[in-house]
Each structure stands twice: as C-alpha cells, then as structure tokens.
Amino acid sequence: MHAGGQSRRLPGYAPSGKILTPIPVFRWARGQKLGQNLLSLQVPLYEKIMERAPEKLRTLIASGDVYIRAEKPLQDIPDADVVCYGLWVDPVLATHHGVFVSDRKQPEALDFMLQKPSLQELENLSKTHLFLMDIGIWLLSDRAVELLMKRSQKDASYSDLKYYDLYSAFGLSLGNHPRIIDDELNKLSVAILPLPGGEFYNYGTSRELLSSTVTLQNKVYDQRQIMHRKVKPNPAIFVQNAEIGVTLSSNNDNLWIENSFVGASWKIGSRQIITGVPRNDWTLALPDGVCVDIVPLAEKRWVVRPYGFDDVFKGDIQDEKTLFLGMPFIGWLAKRGLTPDDVIGRKDDLAAAGICPVVEDIEERRKVLCWMTSELELAEGKKIWLNSQRLSADEISAKADLRQLYAQRESFRKGNWELLARNYEKSVFYQLDLADVAEDFHCLKIDKPDVLPSDAPQMQRIHNRMLRAEIAKLNGKDFLNDE
C-alpha cells in the first residue's frame, strides 16, 4: 500500500501518515468504530479482492490516500499477469488521473494506458474505445512483480534501486498497443475490471479531507436510516477526539478539529484544520483559511506549525509561487521584517526549510502562533521565532513523538466516549460496533453507561443492556442483570 510519503498537501497528518487519518463515523452506517482510520476502512475491500483472486495473483498494490467502496458483489477475477480495477467516471475527472483504455470490441482487455489525458484525447478515443479511471488497485502475478523489480534496479547486478514509476512507466508498457515499447513487459497479459458499484474518495489534500468526508456523510439522506437526531449547523464541520468550548455556527464551513483542545476564548472561522493542540487557556483568533498543527517532540517539547488550507509545501522559498499561509512565502517574510537569510536549512524547497519553531512553554506557543498567523506586530512572538530551534516539515515528520500524539488522542477520545453515551439520543453511540465500544470502555477505564429510561426506543434499550453486560464481563464483574 502506497503510504508514508511527505504528505505535503495534508500537513496535519504528515507525522503519522495520511493512511492513519481518523475518519468520522458515517452517520448512516451501522457497526463502525469511533477510532477508525483510512487504513481500517480500506482493508476489508482489499481482503475480499485477494480472497477471489486466482492463485497466481499474490500481490495487491493500492493507494494509501484514498477510500474506495464497492456497493455490489465483486465479479470473478481473470487469470492474467496484471489485473487493474477502474471506475466509470466523467471525462473531466479522468483528465486528472491515469486512464485504462480498452477497445469497444474487447472491453475486458487493456489496449493501452494514458496518464492524465486531455479532454480532446478522450473525445477522439470515444468513437472506438472505452475508458476507465485508474483507482490504484492493481493485482500482479509473480512474473509481473519480478519484472517490476527488475526495472527498478540499476543495470549493474545487485546494485541500488533507481526511480521507476508504476503508473507512468510500468503502466504505459502494458496492453495490446502499449505507449512504451518493452519486449518483456509488453508480453504480460492484462485485464481491466470495472469495480461494481464503485465509489472513489480522495484524501490526498487538506481540501479533499473535508470534501470527501462531506460527500461520504451525505451519501444517505433518508432520515429512517440515520439513528441519531443531531443536526449540525454546517454539514462540513467535523469534530472528533477533541474538546471544544466555542459555539460552532453555519459560518464554520470546511472546519476539521481533531486531537485538539479549542477553548471558549478561541475565534475560529472557515477552511480550517486544527490538529494536535494540547489543553490550553489561549485567547486566539484564527483567520479564515489558516490551519494549525501542534506536534509533540521528545522531552516535552512541541513544534508549532501553522499553514494555509491549500498550501502544498513545495517550491523555492524566494519564488512568488511558493505559498505559505495562503500567500507568497517571500511576502510572509517581508511583512514580518524578515528575509530568506533568516530561514534555517534549505531554501530550494519549502518542505525542507526550517520555519516551524520548537517551543516548550505553552504561553510562548500561543504568542509565536499569533505572530505567525495574524498579529504581525507582536514583538514577543517574533523574538520567540528567531531564538527558537526551527524544524522543516520533513524534520517534523522524522522527529515527532507519535506515542505522545496517540496518548493525547486517546485522552480526548475518553472524554468523547462519556459525552456520546450521555447524549445517546443525538449521537452515533448505539449504531457503533458495540464490541469495540465495550473494549474501549474497558481499556480506558470508563464506567459503563447508565440503564436507559423506559421511554427510550426498544432497540436502543436492548443495545444498552448488551453493552453494559459486555463491559462488565471484560471488567470481570457480574453481568447477569444486564444479560
């Protein structure tokens, strides 16, 4: 599974990897887990595919920053060297991805593959060919894996690996009329399968984190299938593993708060992702489009990383096209009386430039964050930034204390569990995987929820008793009254 990259376009989950991004429970789903992430949602489909795959197809390659659903049963998988799954999509969407092109007379066989074709190319092909968008699920035979490894090595025997792209090099060498001539790869048999009832959700960027989650949540509008009665002020607000004291409104569009404390004295807006913020008593105003990520390091130190909602952490720091906090980075420096010489580390790539201060004191964290985002005249914030050790985005991922990050998330989740149980009428509590709920209550030492009143829906009362009994069992206590 492709994962563990730099995550330039989704900085909030770069340290742990996008594949471990926590995903909110779908409001219409049954049996999901409060602690679910992108990986746990992806794996069941891939396991089903491998169960149906012929014996010689023993390797599955998939992308780590997507969520793919199949609403219908999988078809039989042909015995080919390479089998790729695709989706029927709008041509405009296909221009941003790889595309499998098949002859209309032989739709199950790959004719050739294209990478990000133009609309004109697709229109010209549509008379004689069909096309499916590549969704990144590839099955390979041992022979195909052997050739892929061979192409990834330098010419000298037992030498180092070289850069070789699965999609733009290997993929374009496949099919009946491949775009790249390679005698060995051209001989591999290839089959293309449309994913039955397939759905594709991209989680590669900060914006897609919100847009894909909104689309998933709104897949079902039928109120009979949605157990809880909570109505959010804006459908694009997501709060999980967090404690918030602010009142959210319809103005908080595209807001994601996770593993964070947002106090009553915060002012937040729209297009914001807030991750990793420890408990605090800050007075803070975040402008629209400004995101905050606080990452724990060893020895009780924290690195402060603000960024823009659409920042990509890419490019020379002196290039006007290189953005930070939604503006040219060179302009961000100038507004604060700084020059590129004040930046630590490399200057040819923003992801490798040391711009994020490491701060121990919690109040100093607030001051430097305010100075970096909105209070340009805050002299103390500038002084802290100049005198602090500063890490690049790459260094943050390398040095993050993931144990502490996960411990903080667990602490917030414990508080969320208690709140969800108390507010069961307006929460997803009783539509979750109750065995997982019981396990979490046991591990986090949370008291079992109270017995529901007699006027609660009957199925909820049954689920309540089942859950109480299971928690008591795990705690080694009497459970017969509930069971």
State where each predicted segment sits.
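Extended hydrophobic secondary-structure segments that form protein cores and membrane-embedded regions
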Residues: 1-3, 58-65, 191-193
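N-terminal nucleotide-binding beta1-loop-alpha1 segment
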Residues: 1-12
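Conformational gate/switch positions in structured elements
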Residues: 5-6, 66, 142, 206
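Flexible, active-site-adjacent loop/turn segments at secondary-structure boundaries
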Residues: 8, 18, 98, 198
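Conserved core of the sugar-phosphate nucleotidyltransferase
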Residues: 14-17, 27-156
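Left-handed beta-helix
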Residues: 82, 88-92, 135-483
